[in-house]
A protein has these predicted regions:
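Extended hydrophobic secondary-structure segments that form protein cores and membrane-embedded regions
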Residues: 153-163
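Internal, well-ordered alpha-helical segments in soluble enzyme and binding-protein domains
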Residues: 98, 125-133, 154, 182, ...
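Short acidic, glycine/proline-rich loop/turn micro-motifs
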Residues: 47-50, 169-173
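Conserved acidic residues
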Residues: 80, 112, 156
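C-terminal accessory domains and tails appended to enzymatic cores
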Residues: 2-5, 144-147, 152-154, 168, ...
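Active-site rim/loop-helix segments in enzyme catalytic domains that contact anionic ligands
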Residues: 1-109, 131, 139, 279
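Active-site adenylate/phosphate-handling loop in enzymes that bind or generate adenylated species
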Residues: 105-151
Length: 283
């Protein structure tokens, strides 16, 4: 058996990683691989009635609960973990200091695959997180950069999760992974982020009064909206799914998480593609 994969997902906020690739994380963990979610910020600005340390502590606890649900669903406690950095929300910048943080995180975890958002995004924290990952890509191999943390011998493959932004160019998927079998786990992971999906985001959209009070009713309300987006990823990558899984299975996929490879990461070959994405065998 080959060495387990090490999958590093870097987002700006303590719900970004699981929101975009939570299903993929569970699939990897179920196969014996290790997944780490990293939030560049502590999330201390994302609310309308609380902030600062209480919100940061709340959001870290939410993230840890989401990771625990993923690990439990994989049957491997600790196989999905969440690291939350103590940088202020809405204040992430592509500074040298922050680049060094990302370089050290990548070196210490030794990822085979790094996943983040594209640099084309509405939120400055998202844009700059993407830039920090790209800026760290080559320098993880340079011994005299962050010299006290042993450098990597290779540049890991980097991929972007899916989005709907069109300029300067639209998201162009290179791989799309079916998440039907874990989609309900993903919904339960996202439901851990109460401060976001049941409070801040509905408030910011003028829909706070629509949120049900009961836990199961809230989950049903949230999932009814989120599952449409999850299904849209499958519909948008239908041809790719059919090619990867075969026409019969690919055309039957309901939910998917697509990725686009970043040209600043390591090269993707037929051999390492098969190792990095061990999901496309016979149904």
């Amino acid at each position: 058996m080959s060495e387990p994969l090490r999958i590093l997902v870097i987002g700006a906020h303590p719900d970004d990683c699981d929101y975009h690739v939570g299903g993929l994380a569970v699939l990897y963990a179920r196969q014996g691989h290790q997944v780490r979610f990293v939030s560049m910020s502590n999330g201390d600005a994302g609310h309308f009635s609380m902030g600062g340390a209480p919100l940061a502590q709340r959001r870290r606890a939410e993230a840890e609960r989401a990771a625990a649900i993923a690990s439990d669903a994989a049957g491997r406690p600790g196989s999905v973990e969440y690291q939350v950095l103590d940088l202020h929300d809405a204040q992430i910048v592509p500074s040298l200091e922050n680049r060094q943080k990302v370089v050290c995180i990548m070196r210490q975890f030794r990822p085979d695959l790094v996943i983040t958002n594209r640099p084309n995004d509405y939120h400055p924290d998202h844009r700059y997180t993407s830039q920090l990952v790209a800026d760290a890509a080559y320098t993880v191999m340079v011994p005299n950069v962050a010299a006290l943390t042993p450098h990597l011998s290779h540049n890991p493959v980097i991929a972007y999760w899916g989005d709907g932004f069109k300029r300067p160019y639209p998201f162009t998927p290179d791989v799309s992974i079916a998440t039907d079998e874990v989609i309900q786990v993903k919904m339960r992971m996202l439901a851990c982020h109460v401060s976001q999906f049941y409070e801040w985001i509905p408030y910011s959209m003028g829909r706070l009064e629509e949120v049900p009070q009961g836990e199961s009713e809230r989950l049903e309300w949230f999932a009814a909206q989120r599952l449409r987006a999850e299904a849209s990823h499958a519909d948008a990558t239908r041809g790719l799914l059919a090619r990867l899984y075969g026409p019969e299975r690919g055309n039957a996929v309901t939910y998917a998480e697509p990725l686009e490879f970043c040209e600043y990461g390591g090269a993707v070959t037929d051999a390492n593609f098969a190792r990095l994405f061990p999901f496309f065998g016979p149904a």
